[in-house]
């Protein structure tokens, strides 16, 4: 756990002592110890327990400074909060760990997510990064050769707001879909990719292209 995550955990425990006394605080549906959460990410069953990750700001009740929170459960009702799985790598100009997915690759828990920073903005600079977990999924280490995918993978096709990978395996190959849009005119789209090892990816084609009437992006 990095220094930022340790600071976040201490802060959460302090705030949780206060918020759990709120009579209007939900008690049945999952929620973090305190502060902001949004998208659930990478739910999976691993070694007899359900794991859930989620977009999380451990320092404020507003969106921002996005980490990956992490919890596990045996019954999907009672949850144990685990240390923050992913924190932004400030030293690598990363300010947010956006949504993604978690899979098991040859026994190794593996997260693939969208990395955002000052020089890689959501519209035209997002990258896809990887992190590897230990056997208990309590500690995560970002892959030393990140990014594993950049916008250059599209070989001249202009893709914007490219984000939120979903990963699955069919036969010998891994596949990924990411959302975004094609500009000029804006057309929301889903893009398809293929890999034999999760590290090296090939862009196949736009899987879905919709009209602007459908919105700006598909996430």
Ranges and model annotations:
Residues 1-164, 168-218:
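Beta-rich carbohydrate-recognition and catalytic domains
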């Amino acid at each position: 756990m990095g220094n930022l995550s340790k600071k976040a955990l201490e802060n959460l425990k302090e705030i949780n002592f206060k918020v759990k006394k709120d009579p209007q605080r939900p008690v049945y549906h999952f929620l973090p110890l305190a502060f902001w959460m949004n998208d659930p990410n990478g739910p999976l069953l691993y070694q007899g327990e359900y794991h859930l990750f989620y977009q999380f700001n451990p320092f404020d009740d507003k969106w921002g400074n996005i980490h990956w929170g992490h919890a596990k459960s045996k019954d999907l009702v009672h949850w144990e909060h685990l240390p923050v799985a992913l924190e932004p790598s400030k030293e690598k100009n990363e300010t947010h760990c956006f949504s993604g997915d978690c899979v098991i690759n040859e026994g190794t828990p593996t997260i693939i997510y969208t990395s955002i920073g000052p020089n890689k903005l959501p519209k035209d600079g997002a990258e896809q990064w990887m992190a590897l977990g230990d056997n208990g999924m309590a500690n995560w280490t970002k892959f030393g050769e990140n990014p594993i995918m950049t916008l250059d993978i599209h070989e001249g096709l202009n893709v914007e707001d490219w984000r939120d990978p979903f990963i699955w395996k069919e036969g010998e190959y891994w596949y990924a879909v990411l959302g975004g849009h094609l500009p000029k005119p804006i057309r929301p789209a889903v893009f398809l990719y293929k890999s034999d090892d999760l590290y090296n990816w090939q862009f196949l084609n736009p899987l879905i292209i919709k009209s602007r009437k459908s919105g700006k992006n598909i996430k």
